[in-house]
């Protein structure tokens, strides 16, 4: 399946979705400071498959998606313009919450920020950072939301498997202006983890 992720025009079940900087504004640390609002940050091909794999995918009731996160920082994270936010996906939980998602890095290097709440989405109980390189896989356990981040200066291509009936739930990421941490880069090129103060409680980030 990985070969279709590297094609210029992979076979999608529908039209590829594109997220511009303007569309990402609800989850950026400082959206009003971000220039070039029509720039495409990432694009998703949902339900991708090769013709010979369609029956297998259908019989197992699963879906294969491809996500490309383009390089390029998203603008300063503060008015002082010291740190710049890293390119990322919007972030989502799953409906139903019991769903499990598997990601594989096709090319590039990824940082996955996964977080979990119990009753109140403003109170995060667990948050982890998982780094993965080419050909490495991660599993998003039930109940966790995920944001995928591209820390490099090159394109990041991800593939994921998810149940066909599972829906992405974006509402709490939008309401709380992103994940519970923002990943930014300082002038030295170091990655900085800034807490999102729209959450009532954020635990210490655990790096796996």
Walk through the language-model features, giving the residues of each.
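Active-site region of the double-stranded beta-helix
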Residues: 1-132, 150-208
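Histidine-centered metal-chelating micro-motifs
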Residues: 136-138, 142-147
